Amino acid sequence: IDYRDQKNNARAGGYYSVTWRRYADLDFDLYNFREIDAVVQQFFPIFDKKRVFAVQGRLMATTADDGQQVPFYFQPTVGGSTSLRSYNDFRFRDETGVYFNFEYRWEAFSALDMALFYDLGSVTPEVDDLRLSNLKDGYGIGFRFNTYKSVLYRIDIGFGGADGVRYFFKFSKAF
């Protein structure tokens, strides 16, 4: 379900998605597994659409069939420019991953939005192992060079993680 006011620089509305996949290893019969990926994004305009409180939550879970395993490159990861910005890309990896992003965005001037963000995330072997107390967190500031309808370039600077200060330079929106 997608009712954001605009896809590439949302200032109001929401996006909700659940994807389920089944992977079958036809060559070696070692890597048969299922994957679910659920994403929730909500954008709350404050007074006008020049200030926005944006929230994202994502749950990724893989389950291997009996006697099978999930290849490491298909395991959910947390850390990096789209999840936990105070940690390196792919910093945490396991069978289940969850993260939450909170951003306060405002228009500094017509071609530049700024953002303050707070991220939480974790990975675990099983969905049942997810605990709020195990979530890693970080915070930071972001700069989005944009047109009204699209983010052209963004710079995010993340603090608070064990990996030190992280800088991300991307030609894409955060979420």
Where do the protein language model's features map onto the residues?
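C-terminal outer-membrane beta-barrel translocator/porin domains of Gram-negative envelope proteins
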Residues: 1-107
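Repeated loop/turn-to-beta-strand initiation elements of outer-membrane beta-barrel proteins
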Residues: 5-9, 47-51, 110-114, 145-155
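Transmembrane beta-strand segments that form the barrel wall of outer-membrane beta-barrel proteins
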Residues: 14-24, 83-90, 114-122, 151-161
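Residue-level detector of the transmembrane beta-barrel scaffold of outer-membrane proteins
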Residues: 15-17, 52-56, 101, 113-117, ...
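Membrane-spanning beta-strands of outer-membrane beta-barrel proteins
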Residues: 33-35, 95-97, 136, 148, ...
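Core subunits and conserved enzymes of cellular information-processing
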Residues: 41-42, 139, 162
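C-terminal hydrophobic structural anchor segments
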Residues: 105-136
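Outer-membrane beta-barrel "beta-signal"
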Residues: 143-147, 164-175
